[in-house]
Amino acid sequence: MELESTSVFDKDIKKLDRHGRKELKGMIDKISVQPEMGKPMEHYSNVFSKRTEHRRLIWKVKKQEGVILLLMYKNRDEVYEELKRLKL
């Protein structure tokens, strides 16, 4: 599947240090092989999350388009606020 990202995700990764980027890259590599490996987000169709020590990676699987859309990489509280704002 092809990986795409939102502008929110792009802003989130700019804030990361080297260790954070390496950790995120490992998660994205796993997701690209098995896109539905994360925890399904309640009330959001085909949206999944994977938790790290301090943040959560949120992505949407668009099966028909063959796309994994990386939505955000934020702490827990920010994730839920941003999901409400995005209205997925």
Regions found by a protein language model. Give the residues of each.
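Short aromatic/hydrophobic contact patches that present stacked aromatics
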Residues: 10, 47-49, 58
